[in-house]
Every structure is written in structure tokens, then in C-alpha cells.
């Protein structure tokens, strides 16, 4: 569908296209879900056509803000004052043809962290891109259920906190 719609860009003149882009989906989207397409391809196709990108799922449903202790420590060692979520937002915001990065915020702390991250945005360096690619590869080595904590499964009739169980 994506390629078909882009093939009609000359006729339809898209103002922007919304894509899912984060440091896991950049090169590993199919490993997360076989129906997905790598964000690197999606973004490159938009750049070819000079179409701005609106980014959704920069935190991969919140998973990139809840890394395991080992992965979190690797990012914190590099930038101790920044949140783990800020790495994902910086990754998404670094690309020049990104119009905006969407962020689902629940708490005031999320908004404050986003403001610190984007005002002003400090783009990721090549070294940081490499670290995030390594983080993505390591994440995929851990057996997980791809739960994005949407809570559609809640409330559980048996009183179980299903998203919390799947997280661990």
C-alpha cells in the first residue's frame, strides 16, 4: 500500500506521510513483526520524493522507555542526565526530513522530558547511531512478547495485570 500510494504522489501531492520510525524499526521492523517494513526504507522513499515525514511510535509503544537494566545502563553511561526515552526521541528527530515526532504523553513528567529533549534538539552523532543500532540488536536477542502496554486486554476478568506480566 505504501509504495502504491507513493507512486501516485505526482498526481495527489502528499503534504506529508506518517510512518513508524524508531531505532528498532529502522532496520529490524520485520524481526518485530513480519508484516512490517523497515523504517529506513520508508523514510528513504519519502526523501526521494521530497515528502516530509510525521513520525509515530518513536518509543515503540513505550518499550524503548522501559529497557532492561543492562541496556539502560549502556545509554545512561553515555548520557547520564538524559532519560532512556530521550534517546529514542533524539533518534527520530535527527533526520532532516522529519516534520514532527508524535509523542503519547500520560504524565507531566513525560511532557517535561520531551521539552528538555526537543528544546533544542541535539541530533544523534554517528557514534550514538551505532550505539542505538547495537541496543536494537541486543533487544531482539531477549525473548519478549511485543506488548505495547495499550491495556486493551484490561481489565482482565481474573484480576491479572497482563501488560505488567508480559513486561517481565
Language-model regions: role of each:
Residues 1-160, 164:
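Beta/alpha (TIM)-barrel catalytic core signal, keyed to glycine-rich beta->alpha loops juxtaposed to Asp/Glu
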Amino acid at each position: 500500500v505504501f509504495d502504491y500510494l507513493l507512486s501516485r504522489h505526482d498526481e495527489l501531492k502528499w503534504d506529508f506521510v506518517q510512518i513508524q520510525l524508531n531505532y528498532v524499526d529502522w532496520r529490524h521492523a520485520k524481526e518485530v513483526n513480519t508484516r512490517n517494513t523497515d523504517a529506513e526504507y520508508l523514510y528513504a522513499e519519502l526523501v526521494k520524493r521530497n515528502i516530509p515525514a510525521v513520525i509515530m511510535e518513536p518509543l515503540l509503544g513505550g518499550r524503548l522507555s522501559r529497557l532492561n537494566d543492562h541496556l539502560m545502563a549502556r545509554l545512561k553511561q553515555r548520557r547520564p542526565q538524559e532519560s532512556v526515552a530521550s534517546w529514542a526521541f533524539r533518534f527520530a528527530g535527527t533526520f532532516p526530513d522529519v516534520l514532527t515526532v508524535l509523542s503519547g504523553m500520560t504524565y507531566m513528567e513525560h511532557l517535561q522530558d520531551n521539552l528538555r529533549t526537543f528544546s533544542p534538539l541535539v541530533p544523534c552523532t554517528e557514534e550514538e547511531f551505532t550505539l542505538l543500532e547495537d541496543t536494537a540488536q541486543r533487544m531482539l536477542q531477549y525473548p519478549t512478547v511485543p506488548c505495547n502496554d495499550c491495556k486493551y486486554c484490561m481489565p482482565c476478568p481474573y484480576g491479572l495485570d497482563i501488560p505488567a506480566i508480559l513486561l517481565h
